[in-house]
A protein has these predicted regions:
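Interfacial transmembrane-helix boundary/kink motif in multi-pass membrane proteins
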Residues: 2-12, 39-46, 64-97, 141-149
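Alpha-helical transmembrane segments in multi-pass membrane proteins
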Residues: 11-62, 111-116
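Residue-level signature of the transmembrane alpha-helical core
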Residues: 15, 51, 90, 118, ...
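Divalent metal-coordination and catalytic microenvironments
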Residues: 18, 72, 129
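Juxtamembrane "helix-exit" motif on the non-cytosolic side of transmembrane helices
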Residues: 23-34, 98-107, 159
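Hydrophobic cores of alpha-helical transmembrane segments in multi-pass inner/ER membrane proteins
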Residues: 49-61, 91-92, 123-130
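Hydrophobic alpha-helical segments and helix pairs
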Residues: 80-126
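Membrane-interface helix/loop boundary segments of multi-pass membrane proteins
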Residues: 127-155
């Protein structure tokens, strides 16, 4: 697979999956269904849309870079920092959700919604880096400088 084709397939797959999920949610809402963070359908949509960059990053890493899925999972889940740093992340995520739960505008109708949102942030919040920083940016760096590649990564990631 060529470099251009890898970039094209990654962007098409990632953004296409997000757009497809967005259109499905729009249509379901237009038909009168409630699809938001409080419903299983909404959480499923957030999960499928949120995992798009990791999924397509893994596909491209396997096909273009010839990485094994085992290597990708090992690289992603290997603890690289002091365990205390991970504890800080969990504490700050908890503080972030406490603010929203007790003082923000989200209204939690059931006790388990903050727990689900917290787990969703941990499971799906950083997984997008597999696609953008692990696959897309290194492919861009084959032809461009680090700064240019970072800017090229920032634009579609921001979309």
């Amino acid at each position: 697979m060529s470099r251009k084709k890898a970039i094209f397939l990654y962007l098409l797959g990632t953004l296409g999956q997000i757009w497809l999920i967005s259109i499905i949610v729009f249509v379901l809402r237009h038909l009168g269904m409630v699809v938001d963070y409080r419903t299983p359908m909404g959480i499923l949509a957030i999960g499928i849309g949120g995992v798009s960059s990791a999924l397509w990053g893994t596909i491209i890493a396997v096909r273009y870079k010839k990485y094994s899925t085992k290597k990708i999972l090992k690289d992603f889940f290997t603890i690289k920092q002091n365990r205390g740093s991970y504890l800080f992340v969990i504490v700050f995520l908890f503080l972030d959700f406490c603010y929203v739960a007790f003082d923000g505008e989200l209204a939690f109708n059931t006790w388990y919604i903050p727990i689900i949102l917290f787990l969703k942030a941990i499971l799906f919040g950083g997984i997008e880096e597999v696609g953008w920083r692990y696959v897309f940016q290194p492919i861009m760096m084959e032809r461009h400088s680090y700064i240019s590649s970072t800017l090229f990564t920032f634009v579609p990631w921001g979309i």
